[in-house]
Amino acid sequence: MRFLIVFTLLLTASFSIAQPKQNSPYSKFGIGDPVNQFFANSAAWGGQSAAFHDPYHLNIVNPASFAFLRTTSLETGLFAKYSHLTTATSTKDNWSGNLAYAALGFTLRSPINEVLDKTKSPWQFGMGIALTPYSLVGYNVQTIDTLPDLGVVVNSFEGSGGTYRLNWSNAAKYKNTAVGINLGWTFGKSTYENTTTFSDSLPTFFNNRREDVSVNGFIWNIGVQHDFVLKTADNDKTVPLRWITLGVTGEGKHDLKSIYDQLFIRSRGLLSNGTYDDADTLASALVS
């Protein structure tokens, strides 16, 4: 039953996250606009994630936090983004948003069994799985210029896609110290398309350049959290009431593979059906 819930969750999230979600010209560069990996509860604390843990909320930034879970937790999040873009001659306001993440975490040692058995182990274990966007590409920009001897030149720039992270978290805690590891797979495809139209020239010229970049690879990071207990409950010294948490995370070099496809089409002559007669077509692919 738990496997079915996880599978349904990830399948639904993959379709939702993959939908168009933003219009940011800056996402043209690199692999796109980076996406914060912390969830809503951490966002309410200003993105503080290294030392954050909670019995009911998830934190994939520091996997050690999963050992502090005391129940099964299912989290999904939405995001909204407002952009105000300004050029020398115009301004543009844009709202965008989508499903931000879907995650499931659970403890591997039931607190109910501890109550029934009247025993409390110093060991705790937690596990979780999450699907999150890692970077986003999305823009649609058009410029219109009038040049001497060429007339009106229209340049269109469009981009879509992004990269995503499927993450598996595991953690163990002994007394007040927890360690954890994230094992993840990053994948995704981004498309960048530039179109130039010389609409006043005869015959009309139309240049189109499309780049497809696919990225995939294994990533990982580790985390440690330790609670410095300041005060415990009077009737149970194992229950902390006040504490300070120190958390650290680290990661090594990630080996990501990319496939770069490029297509260039130059067309001339506007046909009666509104399409162009292809003049040249060039295609190339690069794997790195």
List the model feature ranges, each with a label:
Residues M1-N23:
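Bacterial Sec-dependent N-terminal signal peptides
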Residues Q19-S288:
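Subset of outer-membrane beta-barrel
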